[in-house]
Amino acid sequence: MVDAFCATWKLTDSQNFDEYMKALGVGFATRQVGNVTKPTVIISQEGGKVVIRTQCTFKNTEINFQLGEEFEETSIDDRNCKSVVRLDGDKLIHVQKWDGKETNCTREIKDGKMVVTLTFGDIVAVRCYEKA
């Protein structure tokens, strides 16, 4: 089912992302850049692993992992996390844990778009991507 996510995606809409970044402790200047940047996300499968590349003018990141297996990740805002990504039905759920905290990133395909819901505590941000 990961195949449905394998594509190049361009951000088209973002809601409440500044509040989400603020809750994570991201500084003002970085949040300003994050709010205007429209990243491209490339999801693929390579050698039995899922690869998610995020490209933007601010910073490029890449994670590769096997579904359901914990891996070390440095987030785009430089948090050192222990992460797990799993497939739950038609949703790709990415959980990051660091310093006793946890955030969830749920990716799902709706009407040909990738909808990404970011949750940290009671703060929810939604970012929508279309195929590039």
From Swiss-Prot:
Family: Belongs to the calycin superfamily. Fatty-acid binding protein (FABP) family.
Keywords, in A-Z order: Acetylation, Cytoplasm, Lipid-binding, Transport
Gene Ontology MF annotations: fatty acid binding
N-acetylvaline found at: V2
Localisation per UniProt entry: Cytoplasm
Main location: cytoplasm
PROSITE patterns membership: FABP (PS00214)
Protein's UniProt name: Fatty acid-binding protein, brain
Stretch forming the signal peptide: none
Function: B-FABP could be involved in the transport of a so far unknown hydrophobic ligand with potential morphogenic activity during CNS development. It is required for the establishment of the radial glial fiber system in developing brain, a system that is necessary for the migration of immature neurons to establish cortical layers.
Pfam families given in the database record: Lipocalin
Tissue distribution of the protein: Expressed in brain and other neural tissues.
InterPro entries reported in the protein's UniProt record: Calycin (IPR012674), Fatty_acid-bd (IPR000463), ILBP (IPR031259), Lipocln_cytosolic_FA-bd_dom (IPR000566)
Superkingdom of this protein's organism: Eukaryota
GO biological process, one term: neurogenesis
